[in-house]
């Protein structure tokens, strides 16, 4: 928060026994509210001896509870198990000095300001190794509408993404909302089935001009934007997407007319710009027409009604 000059914030609640505070503040550059978790809880959270450092199944991170100002958040003892595993996972990736950046996100969940609910993200893995898209969030003026969709295969193959049939994959209630209505559609999928693919998650957005998306900077592997959403191949190794500019022939044909946002927040391309602040990369869509956008993420994601992407794995 000091990095972007935030001095005033509102405390929404505290996490029992973890020295954490859930706060909300107004971003000084973009003007929207940002939820954040403050505290060095990873190295200080007590870990019961019987617990082993292994992660639970997706959707089992924490219990469903209410967030109210001045009252602690109830949580399962399994949260300590998650934190112990995260310590080993992140030691090789980053330092503990920026704990809010990488260590709070894996135990975060969806924050819905409409009724201040606190719920864990959920997803289902089909036997074929694909992610069954069971949650679609539609954002319009900060309000989220949940819907169900059919199984979507986000492997980057052309036959799986015909532009004319994409809307037919969604539920009727969601498919009727065309991008011309100035609404934004998100979809979560996995690309681990490909032979040379790394086990990452892909976030597909149907973005409209001026839409803003926030996500933790260190979790973004790459982003590809395409007006047609066809004939594009995902990078087989997301790590290659973060090494800076390179020849399109070495990176794949999907770079044209797409673009890639690197981990350091620098941008290449002309459709999208990024802003670094409070450990978040703020992506603002600036196309002239609604376009599809796919993000390669290094963890599973859950999207809130404010556009903040929390990671859980």
Curated annotation (Swiss-Prot):
Reactions that this protein is recorded to catalyse: a beta-lactam + H2O = a substituted beta-amino acid
Active-site residue list: 190 (acyl-ester intermediate)
Keywords noted in UniProt: Antibiotic resistance, Hydrolase, Signal
Protein name: Beta-lactamase
Leader sequence residues: 1-15
GO CC field: outer membrane-bounded periplasmic space
InterPro entries registered for this protein in UniProt: Beta-lactam_class-C_AS
GO terms for biological process, alphabetical: antibiotic catabolic process; response to antibiotic
Superkingdom, taxonomy of origin: Bacteria
GO molecular function terms noted in the UniProt entry: beta-lactamase activity
Top class in the EC scheme: hydrolase
Similarity annotation: Belongs to the class-C beta-lactamase family.
